[in-house]
From Swiss-Prot:
Main location (coarse class): nucleus
Protein name, per record: Zinc finger protein GAI-ASSOCIATED FACTOR 1
Positions of region (Disordered): 1-47, 196-254
Tissue expression from the record: Observed in vegetative tissues. Mainly expressed in hypocotyls, petioles, shoot apices, root tips, and trichomes, and, at low levels, in leaves, stems and flowers.
InterPro entries: C2CH-3rd_BIRD-IDD, C2CH-4th_BIRD-IDD, C2H2-2nd_BIRD-IDD, IDD1-16, Znf_C2H2_sf, Znf_C2H2_type
Annotated organism of origin: Arabidopsis thaliana
Source species, domain of life: Eukaryota
Residue sites binding Zn(2+) 2 per the record: C168, C170, H183, C187
Gene that produces this protein: GAF1
Chain ranges of zinc fingers (C2H2-type): 63-85, 104-134, 139-162
Residue ranges, annotated region (SHR-binding): 176-188
Amino acid sequence: MPVDLDNSSTVSGEASVSISSTGNQNPLPNSTGKKKRNLPGMPDPESEVIALSPKTLLATNRFVCEICNKGFQRDQNLQLHRRGHNLPWKLRQKSNKEVKKKVYVCPEVSCVHHDPSRALGDLTGIKKHFCRKHGEKKWKCDKCSKKYAVQSDWKAHSKICGTKEYKCDCGTLFSRRDSFITHRAFCDALAEENARSHHSQSKKQNPEILTRKNPVPNPVPAPVDTESAKIKSSSTLTIKQSESPKTPPEIVQEAPKPTSLNVVTSNGVFAGLFESSSASPSIYTTSSSSKSLFASSSSIEPISLGLSTSHGSSFLGSNRFHAQPAMSATALLQKAAQMGAASSGGSLLHGLGIVSSTSTSIDAIVPHGLGLGLPCGGESSSGLKELMMGNSSVFGPKQTTLDFLGLGRAVGNGNGPSNGLSTLVGGGTGIDMATTFGSGEFSGKDISRRKS
């Protein structure tokens, strides 16, 4: 019995020595100066290098109890377990000679830590290194399906998985924000590069897209020659006019914007004097087969002398044209006076340069005096000339109050001068003069009818 006590005391003494020796292996760092920590895999050159096989490293229970077959990772734990079975147990004691520090190398030949100069100084560290880098990943996370080769890593991940995470568009999960930002920048750059390559490929495969975006402009049509256009339109109108039996050949002339002068009478004094054509307002025909009524030089501004009746018929015999290009009023009257004086016909139409192609006389077309009761015989044209020059006896001292020209003055009362038709036409263009013949000397019965 006392032997047992001595044995127990001896065992306790060995345990104390072992604990003290292990405590001396990790001395406290000096407070005065920090000791630089050795980099991983850079052990002390004097350390003992130990190479273990993969089976030994992966073994969970290296030390097994022979009574209950319970395994332990450390021999010290097994010795303490033996005390429960009342078996002899022995703890390592500190020897007098110094024990060298042990380092462990990785059993994988291709690993950098297989070199003794890069050996790891901890048995647990070398085990975890071998499992992480070269072992099988046995533990899997239930939330993110991530696998781990070390059980401790799996447990640490399971505690924080799903609590705070950053998910990229590509599906990768990150628990740290800095890692997520770095990955996101790389992922965005990669996506942009892929988009550019895809766009370039689509352009090569579909060249029609470029033609749709940049259509070829239509060629500008060549300018049309105005002279040829005039000739073509003139020939067309000539053909159209030739189809009508009443319309003689025409002379086409373009003129500036005309100004109309309308004289309204009660019975159509000059209605039917000219025949209207179906051409545009700038193109017209006359009753003469050789020359136009209003043919003049381009330097004279044209004017249209439109004398219309109260029934709405125009001077040219059509309501479709309200203005016809012609000479100015002053030039028209001067020409009429000159040609009327030199002509033997003595009519207004002959004075204006209109010569009928038929044998019908001027008296048959327009009655004597133009229906105004004026002497206009074939012997002389003094009556009409006087009317045109303003010296006719119509404006003489006759007892009538008829406002013949609609100018607000009494004609024939002798109170003021009158200039006749020359004053009327020479006064300007665009004037409508209403002449009322219902009473007095000039009755509507004296006005001749239009040509049948």
